[in-house]
Amino acid sequence: MLSKTNFIKQPIVHSSVLPLTLMFLKNWILIKLQGTDIIQYLHNQFTCDIKNLNKNQYSFAAHCNFNGRMISNMYVFYINNQKIAFIEPLNIHHKQISIMQKYATFSNVTITPDYNVTLIGASGLYVKKYLNTFFTTLPDTKNMVIHYPGITLLHFKLPIDRFLLIIYDQTILDFLLNKTQSFPIYYNSYHQWTALDIEAGYPYIDFATSELFFPQAANMDILQGISFNKGCYIGQELVARIQHYKLNKQSLYQLTSNTYHNQHNQLPVSGDHIVLRQKNNQIWKHIGTVLQSCQMQEGNICIQAILNKSFIKETEVYFQHNELIYSNINLKILEK
């Protein structure tokens, strides 16, 4: 009998050659909110327009501090008529909830992490055909969120069709995992989903990169995760000023390389600095920060980073973890 233990890390491949794959997204978590004030409360907290969020849609969003810098990013959506939920990186959720609860003191709002749900990603060849054996209707670009008893499905269109399954009922997960005989199906860890997010240009702000960047630096405006027409929210004044005066000097990039020289055998991790040598190799200049990375099956590495826009797009750079400069790499940089 298949279970979550089947989702061990396997070779990571590009979306163009991805077979039908289920991925265990243990690095994400579902946060539920309920109460009579949830709409107004979240509208005053998140960068997106909660008041106009449709029941069949989700929205990219960011939660900022007073300086307009992202505490984290998330996908926010309705899970029923009375509850709103969002999905965010697991390792930031304690900090995130603690900050949000400070502003919920005088509101009828309850914020609860759901540790009992299972988040599964589905993508690759024949993914729609596979899911249609269980669900008559799948979410798409128009109806991005669909609910069934015990499960919610979200659709993501980039870099290829993929689905996030929010499974509330363990028996549904068991059924999905043990009714796959008609399909050649692979099981992988969240690292494959990470690779797809990097391809898609979907940012990942976790504990190590929390409160470092304005949302525009993570392309949240391009992803329609910022409403510039709504009322005030935390950090709104600075976020709006950056947009109005075109002051954003950073952007989200996809970095890829076939050469990776690292004596410590360490991949870049969230929060690592990206630096350049300057002035006869005596001075290190900080030019960016790693958000997430993965090593592909063919050996090259794929990195998501926020870089200064003034950075030269093809050059040799180094990674710095704490005080250790541990590797150099020749990069090809693709802006998303």
UniProtKB/Swiss-Prot annotation:
It comes from Blochmanniella floridana. Belongs to the tRNA-modifying YgfZ family. One of its GO terms (biological process) is RNA modification. This is tRNA-modifying protein YgfZ. It comes from the Bacteria. GO terms for molecular function: folic acid binding. Signal peptide: none annotated. Pfam families: YgfZ_barrel (PF21130). Folate binds at W28, W193. Its main location: cytoplasm.
